[in-house]
UniProtKB/Swiss-Prot annotation:
Keyword Ribosomal protein: no
Family: Belongs to the YcgR family.
Designated name of the protein: Flagellar brake protein YcgR
Molecular function as annotated in GO: cyclic-di-GMP binding
Protein function: Acts as a flagellar brake, regulating swimming and swarming in a bis-(3'-5') cyclic diguanylic acid (c-di-GMP)-dependent manner. Binds 1 c-di-GMP dimer per subunit. Increasing levels of c-di-GMP lead to decreased motility.
Subcellular location per the Swiss-Prot or TrEMBL entry: Bacterial flagellum basal body
Subunit structure, as described in the record: Monomer. Interacts with the flagellar basal bodies.
Domain (PilZ) ranges: 134-254
Main location as per UniProt: other
Cellular component terms per the entry's GO annotation: bacterial-type flagellum basal body
Keywords, sorted A to Z: Bacterial flagellum, c-di-GMP, Nucleotide-binding
Length: 269
C-alpha cells in the first residue's frame, strides 16, 4: 500500500542554483527509460506523485511493474482516496524520486486505476522522457520515526512562551523538512529567515550531534499522515551552513543509511 508523505519528500531539492555541479540529463530512449524505471523498482525507491507541477501535495508510491510491450507503468495506489480521485480525474502525475542518489523526474499521462495482483494500482503510459539531475546538496534521507531529529526555533514562542520545537521529516546538507502538529495553523511562513535554530540529531539512545543553523522557509505545504491527519509540512533551506555542521549532517545521513541497510539485511530484503 502506498504511504502518504509522512516523511521524506526526496523530491524537493533545497540546493541553491550555485550548488548545481552537473547539467540536467534527459533520457529519451525507450529502452533506457525502462532500464531506469526497472532500477527504481528493484531498489524499492519511493516515488512522490505530485498532482500538479507547482503542488506540494503528493502521494508516496512505488513502482510495481514496468511493461515495455504494453507501454505501461504500474504504481502503488494511494492510501487517501480523495487524492487518488483528484489524480485520476486529472489523468496526470508529476513523478519525482531518486536512484543511486540522483534525482529522477518524469511525467505520467493517461493515469487510470487498475487491478494488479488482487489490489488497486495506478496505471500510466511509460514516459516519453525522463530527466536525471545531479545536485550536490540534493540527497535527502528520512529521519527516524521512533527517534526523530528535532529543530528548536528560539525566535518563535508557543502559548506558554517556550521555544517552538518541530520534528524533522528528512534532512540533507542543503536543507530539511519539518512537520507541525495536526491541523495546526503553523507559525512559519514562506520566505521567513530564522537564525540560531538548534537541530538535535539523535543517536543510539543519546544525542548524535547538535548544530546551530540559520534557515529560510522555502515553502509551507501539507502532509497527510497514515492515520488520515493533515499536518503542515515546512521545507527549509540552510543559509551559509558552516563546513563543520555540514560534515556532521553528512555523518548523520551515513549513519541512517547504515541503519537502513542493516534492517534490510535482517528482514531479508
Amino acid at each position: 500500500m502506498a504511504i502518504l508523505q509522512t516523511f521524506s519528500e526526496q523530491t524537493i531539492s533545497s540546493a541553491r542554483a550555485s550548488d548545481i555541479k552537473e547539467p540536467d540529463y534527459s533520457v529519451n530512449s525507450r529502452p533506457e527509460i525502462c532500464f531506469f524505471l526497472n532500477g527504481i523498482m528493484e531498489e524499492k525507491s519511493l516515488i512522490s506523485l505530485y498532482l500538479a507541477r507547482d503542488s506540494h501535495s503528493a502521494i508516496l508510491s512505488s513502482i510495481l511493474a514496468v511493461d515495455p510491450q504494453q507501454k505501461l507503468l504500474i504504481m502503488d495506489y494511494g492510501i487517501n482516496e480523495t487524492l487518488n480521485q483528484i489524480a485520476l480525474k486529472r489523468g496526470y502525475l508529476r513523478c519525482i524520486t531518486s536512484h543511486n542518489q540522483i534525482r529522477i523526474e518524469f511525467d505520467c499521462d493517461n493515469l487510470q486505476r487498475v487491478q494488479f495482483e488482487g489490489r488497486h494500482a495506478f496505471s500510466a503510459d511509460i514516459p516519453e522522457s525522463l530527466k536525471r539531475l545531479q545536485r550536490r546538496n540534493f540527497y535527502r534521507v528520512t529521519t527516524s520515526i521512533t527517534n526523530p531529529a528535532v529543530c528548536t526555533i528560539p525566535l518563535l514562542r508557543a502559548a506558554d512562551e517556550a521555544p517552538v520545537v518541530y520534528s524533522l521529516l528528512d534532512i540533507s546538507c542543503g536543507g530539511m523538512a519539518l512537520i507541525d502538529q495536526p491541523d495546526a495553523d503553523t507559525l512559519l511562513k514562506a520566505g521567513t529567515t530564522l537564525e540560531h535554530c538548534r537541530i538535535d540529531l539523535p543517536g543510539d539512545g543519546n544525542l548524535f550531534s547538535s548544530i546551530e543553523a540559520s534557515i529560510q522557509i522555502a515553502y509551507v505545504g501539507t502532509v497527510i499522515l497514515n492515520n488520515g491527519n493533515t499536518c503542515p509540512r515546512i521545507g527549509c533551506e540552510f543559509i551559509n551552513l558552516p563546513e563543520k555542521s555540514r560534515l556532521l549532517i553528512q555523518r548523520y545521513i551515513t549513519k541512517l543509511e547504515q541503519q537502513a541497510r542493516k534492517l534490510e539485511t535482517e528482514s531479508g530484503f
